[in-house]
């Protein structure tokens, strides 16, 4: 019987949701956040003509950018001309989640995971995976 209780407690701990965080928008109306590693940073904004976009940059081992619009699959850019990552003072702590508009993200020690409901990406030092 004790074994069953321990198994149930273990399953409950896996189902525990991440702590949700909110970030205040800048004077320009966009939201920026940076992972604790200072290797990944994101900007959420309403891009004129394209709608809502979440743009996340990874610095190392090679600079790249992922852009996820409110609809559709993410796009990965490996030749970024305006590399500007990771100056935000909003830290997206590990074990937390964030949601704004159609986007939701989770911060873990193994990287960043974001989606727009149908499509998304994971981003870390090892690479980027889109779906």
Which residues fall in each region the model found?
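Bacterial N-terminal signal peptides
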Residues: 5-15
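Processing junctions and N-termini across compartments
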Residues: 14, 36, 50, 79-80, ...
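Sec/Tat signal peptide C-region and signal peptidase I cleavage site
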Residues: 16-20
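A low-complexity, Ser/Thr/Gly/Pro-enriched, surface-exposed linker/loop concept
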Residues: 21-25, 49-94, 124-131
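Extracellular glycan-recognition/adhesion modules and their associated mucin-like linkers
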Residues: 28-44, 93-100, 104-106
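Extracellular secreted precursors and ectodomains with disulfide-bonded cysteine-rich loops/domains
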Residues: 40, 54, 83-84, 103, ...
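Disulfide-rich extracellular modules and peptides
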Residues: 44, 58, 87-88, 107, ...
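Short, exposed beta-strand-loop hairpins at the edges of beta-sheets
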Residues: 104-123
């Amino acid at each position: 019987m004790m074994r069953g209780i321990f198994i149930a407690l273990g399953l409950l701990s896996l189902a525990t949701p991440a702590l949700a965080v909110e970030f205040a928008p800048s004077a320009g109306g966009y939201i920026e956040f940076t992972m604790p590693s200072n290797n990944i940073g994101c900007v959420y904004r309403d891009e004129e003509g394209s709608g809502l976009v979440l743009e996340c940059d990874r610095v190392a081992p090679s600079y790249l950018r992922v852009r996820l619009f409110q609809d559709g699959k993410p796009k990965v850019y490996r030749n970024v001309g305006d590399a500007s990552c990771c100056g935000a003072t909003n830290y997206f702590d590990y074990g937390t989640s964030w949601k704004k508009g159609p986007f939701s993200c989770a911060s873990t020690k193994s990287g960043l995971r974001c989606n727009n409901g149908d499509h998304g990406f994971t981003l870390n030092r090892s690479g980027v995976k889109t779906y």
